[in-house]
UniProtKB/Swiss-Prot annotation:
It is an enzyme of class 2 (transferase). GO terms for molecular function: DNA-directed RNA polymerase activity; zinc ion binding. Essential component of the helicase/primase complex. Unwinds the DNA at the replication forks and generates single-stranded DNA for both leading and lagging strand synthesis. The primase initiates primer synthesis and thereby produces large amount of short RNA primers on the lagging strand that the polymerase elongates using dNTPs. Signal peptide: none annotated. This is DNA primase. Residues 596-626 are annotated as: Disordered. The gene is UL70.
Length: 946
């Protein structure tokens, strides 16, 4: 049968109804497309609003071609009058199309009873016929509709309509338009004016030379559609195959699927694919779209899956994608490049002294004490900040001065003013640890301690009496060590020092031990873990740690290198969920202020990420175990994992520790045996908190409690030891147990004590950097980093944009920006609009802190962050709070300027502050102003507040 797609200049539904009722009018129908097939009947069609099984046109009436002579109108490119259609109407073929509308008999005395003739039925059901036509069919009356839907050129419209409307396929209009562009690579015909009449539009289509190419295009489109389906099916198969065999965490798996499709179907990749499958006029129809089969899948494998195959394999990841830079130092103790010559000393002091000796004070008392020290030593030593930062600097400094006060020339440290007790003088030659102690009612004191009684105050004398020095399992050995338990806190800082102590990280000191805050997020419904599961988890984590240590640093002997595990005590049975909080369990910013205006402890912060379970105990091993669960934790399982760096190896910058934690986070998900254990019970991604490796952050020490925020005076969730003995000490584990009880092995900045002798010790080394080549930033994982590479607009590098603002177009390729250049940019282009907004929209008591007579100092912290300080002689001062007027206002609020880029050369600057009070959300980042700074050759826009 022959199909004719037609249109009208008047309402098509009424015109069709006139044809059906054989009511002659002066209207015409305009044939647009014809699909010829030898037949006596011609079906006139309209486009349907809905398509079932990809049928997008349907007939509205049929005519006898012997009467109509359709070819005569097509050859003359003329419209068909309604009279010709009425004369040739084939009622036998047309009547079934509307039979469902004529179910109600119509009685008419004028027609001798029941109406049976078709035209009379249409007449009496005229409203139903019109409603049916309007609901089922699209009835455009203007060429502009066809142009806007199918294309603006002659070839685009004709070929798209022919394939999309007449061929039973599942392609969208956009897909067919792409096929047309690949088929007609050079010429798509003339542009059709949108103001053309329907007659002109019909004559253009009927006389178009592209009519001769319809059959070739249909064959090409079918082949191309088949090729596209095959390519996409292969991409689906590859993505699913990698997802099934890779051990990806749940969230990473979801992001991986999006990344994989964005990589395979990126714009540049599809343009290459179009060139591969473009129409070849010299090839046979069956040879079209057969070049380079599997193109998209092959490129996906090359650009992503092969990389992920290596990146998500532990051995390949550590060998190919992680690089470590270590600096070898001189072994001579008197050399300037030896650890001693470089001042790379760890904590001194005694852990088993005769008494507790040190400074204890709140933040207010600390500020007063540091002010006193500045007054006493101002002519000799540089002034200290009156905050925790100043205390950390004081306790880390190795600077000394000469004095004749004793009658002879001697040297003394500035710490002498902090701890003036003469007996402590020898202990002040080396750095001192700084701790935070959590007191009842959410109060905190800071401690700088030179001597303490660790073992005598913390452990019973007969603690190791029943610990065997023979071969024992880890589980049995752990159960032989019993610690006395306390639950009520004391208001005395000296007493509480041995119950709720946190070590404060000091970036001025080298790091000897890697302290990991490991919070394993449990799946919903997991409310209890068997003992075997917990210890197998620790053994698996130890295996991963040793694999990473051996790969990154060398000189690691897995059979003897110590890894110390501590687990947060389970909540009591009466607690339905993990009341102590969820991930990120012990770290906190530590610049606490007065007790009346201080921040929340870490528990409040932890609850943000808590995902409590509400189920019952689930078995995690295949063996049948009817004993009660060993661990009743819900939501998360908190571990502290501490291991020293290899012998004679230290880290000197917090970024190294954050990078190591990032590597470990990824490695934990790649160990096959460990993944098998973790997958049913947990979400192992990002279990290590990298935030604790910042200056002034603290982490709870092993054997210490947490304060219950609700009760105020009760302690809970003590960090208890789990002994995972290395193989070399399996026969005599007592020495390892003693090492895990030794405080010196559990601190960031203390050299390990009683480190087992190694067959071959390395020379003194400093870890300069650890870098993931694919994910150099600790803020983004592999998926996020790769996603940036396939986005439509790639963000310009910050160095490039800063250079453009400093030097114009000639400097946009600068390799690096110095701190001096960055300061100049901030002073000349960034700070003026920020200050203008401050003075216009903030209270005078806030803005006057940044205006004359105050002198501001801008201190770059990397390329994207600049600290704002006030100069006070040789000292620097911070600011009062920019948000509120607190009851005890202090100049301790840190202010920063963040710089970031977009896809253009515009530079975004944000002014933000960090206040340490509860009212300001306890050290949260508070953004005040964000402005967009256009390049130097563009006008400056107004600042907008955030």
């Amino acid at each position: 049968m022959t199909l004719v797609l037609f249109a009208t200049e008047y309402d098509s539904a009424h015109i069709v109804a006139n044809v059906l009722s054989q009511t002659p009018t002066d209207h015409c129908v305009f044939p647009l497309l014809v699909k010829h097939q030898v037949s006596r009947r011609v079906y006139f069609c309209l486009q349907t609003q809905k398509c079932s099984d990809s049928r997008r046109v349907a007939p509205v009436f049929a005519v006898n071609n012997e009467t109509l002579q359709l070819s005569r109108y097509l050859a003359a490119r003329q419209p068909i009058p309604l009279s010709a259609l009425i004369a040739s109407l084939d009622e036998a073929e047309t009547r079934p199309l509307y039979r469902h509308l004529f179910r109600t008999p119509v009685l008419s005395p004028e027609h001798g009873g029941e109406v049976r003739e078709f035209k009379h039925l249409v007449y009496f059901h005229h409203a139903a016929v019109l409603r049916h036509l309007n609901q089922v069919f699209l009835c455009p009356t203007s060429p502009s509709w066809f142009i806007s839907v199918f294309g603006h050129t002659e070839g685009q419209v004709l070929l798209t309509m022919a394939y999309y409307l007449f061929e039973g396929q599942y392609s969208t209009i956009s897909t067919v338009e792409e096929y047309v562009r690949s088929f007609c690579t050079r010429d798509l015909g003339t542009i059709i004016p949108t103001h053309a009449s329907m007659g002109e539009f019909a004559r253009l289509l009927l006389g178009s030379p592209f009519r001769q190419r319809v059959s070739a295009f249909v064959a090409y489109a079918v082949a191309r559609n088949r090729r596209d389906y095959t390519e996409l099916e292969q991409v689906d198969t590859q993505i699913n195959a990698f997802r099934e065999r890779a051990r990806l965490p749940d969230t990473v798996c979801v992001h991986y699927v999006y990344l994989a499709y964005r990589t395979a179907l990126a714009r540049a990749r599809l343009l290459e694919y179009r060139r591969v499958v473009a129409y070849d006029a010299d090839a046979a129809p069956e040879a079209q779209c057969t070049r380079e089969p599997g193109f998209l899948g092959r490129r996906l494998s090359t650009e992503l899956l092969d990389v992920m195959q290596k990146y998500f394999s532990l051995d390949n990841f550590l060998h190919d994608y992680v690089e470590t830079h270590l600096l070898r130092l001189d072994e001579s103790p008197h050399s300037a490049t030896s650890p001693h010559g470089l001042g790379l000393a760890g904590y001194g002091g005694r852990i088993d002294g005769t008494h507790l000796a040190g400074f204890f004070g709140t933040s207010t008392q600390l500020a007063r004490q540091l002010e006193r020290i500045n007054t006493l030593s101002e002519s000799v030593f540089s002034p200290l900040e009156r905050s925790l930062s100043g205390l950390l600097r004081l306790c880390a400094s190795l600077r000394t001065a000469q004095t004749y006060t004793t009658g002879t020339l001697t040297r003394y440290s500035q710490r002498r003013y902090l701890l003036p007790e003469p007996a402590l003088a020898p202990l002040l030659e080396r750095p001192l640890p700084v701790y935070r102690v959590h007191l009842p009612n959410d109060q905190h004191v800071f401690c700088a301690v030179a001597s303490e009684t660790w073992h005598r105050s913390l452990f019973p004398r007969d603690l190791l009496r029943h610990v065997p020095d023979s071969r024992f399992s880890d589980e049995a050995l752990t159960e032989t060590v019993w610690l006395h338990d306390d639950d009520v806190a004391s208001t005395s800082p000296e007493t509480q020092f041995y119950y709720t102590r946190h070590e404060v990280f000091n970036e001025r000191l080298p790091v000897f031990n890697f302290v990991a805050d490991f919070d394993l997020r449990l799946r919903d419904g997991v409310s209890g873990l068997a003992r075997h599961t917990v210890f197998e988890l620790c053994r698996g984590l130890r295996r991963v740690w040793m694999t990473v240590w051996a790969s990154l640093f060398g000189y690691t002997h897995p059979d003897r290198h110590p890894v110390y595990f501590f687990k947060s005590a389970c909540p009591p049975n009466s607690v339905p969920v993990d009341a102590a909080g969820a991930p990120f369990d012990d770290d906190d910013y530590l610049d606490y202020r007065d007790e009346r205006d201080t921040e929340e402890d870490e528990d409040g912060k932890e609850d943000k990420n808590n995902v409590p379970g509400n189920g019952v105990f689930q078995k995690t091993t295949s063996s049948v175990d009817t004993s009660p669960p060993y661990c009743r934790c819900k939501g998360k399982l908190g571990l502290r994992i501490i291991t020293p760096f290899p012998a004679c190896t230290i880290a000197v910058h917090p970024s190294v520790l954050r990078a190591v934690a990032q590597v470990l986070n990824h490695a934990v998900c790649l160990d096959a045996e460990l993944h098998t254990l973790l997958d049913p019970i947990s979400h192992p991604e990002s279990s290590l908190d990298t935030g604790i490796y910042h200056h002034g952050r603290s982490v709870r020490l092993p054997y210490m409690y947490k304060m219950d925020q609700d009760d105020g005076y009760f302690m809970h969730r003590r960090l208890l030891p789990l002994f995972i003995v290395p193989d070399a000490y399996r026969e005599h584990p007592l020495g390892f147990v003693r090492a895990q009880l030794d405080l010196r092995n559990l601190l960031h900045h203390h050299p390990p004590h009683d480190l087992p002798a190694l067959p071959l010790s390395p020379p003194p080394r400093v870890i300069l950097s650890v870098r993931d080549k694919i994910c150099p930033s600790t803020e983004a994982n592999f998926i996020e980093t790769r996603s940036l590479n396939v986005t439509r607009y790639r963000r310009r590098g910050l160095t490039e944009v800063l250079a453009y603002h400093l030097y114009g177009g000639d400097g946009a390729t600068a390799a690096a920006i110095s701190d001096t250049d960055l300061q100049r940019l901030v002073v000349t282009r960034v700070w003026p609009p920020l200050l203008e907004h401050l003075t216009q929209h903030y209270e005078p008591h806030v803005s006057e802190q940044f205006t004359a007579p105050h002198v501001l100092l801008f201190q770059p912290h990397g390329a994207c962050c600049v600290a704002v300080k006030r100069r006070d002689g040789a000292r620097t001062r911070d600011f009062r709070c920019l948000n509120y007027t607190h009851r005890n206002p202090q100049e301790t609020v840190q202010v920063f300027i963040d710089l970031r880029t977009e896809h253009s050369y515009a530079l975004w600057a944000s002014l933000w502050s960090r206040c340490f009070t509860k009212k300001c959300h306890s050290n949260a980042k508070n953004v005040h102003i964000s402005i967009k700074i256009r390049p130097p050759d563009a006008p400056m826009p107004p600042a907008t507040a955030v």
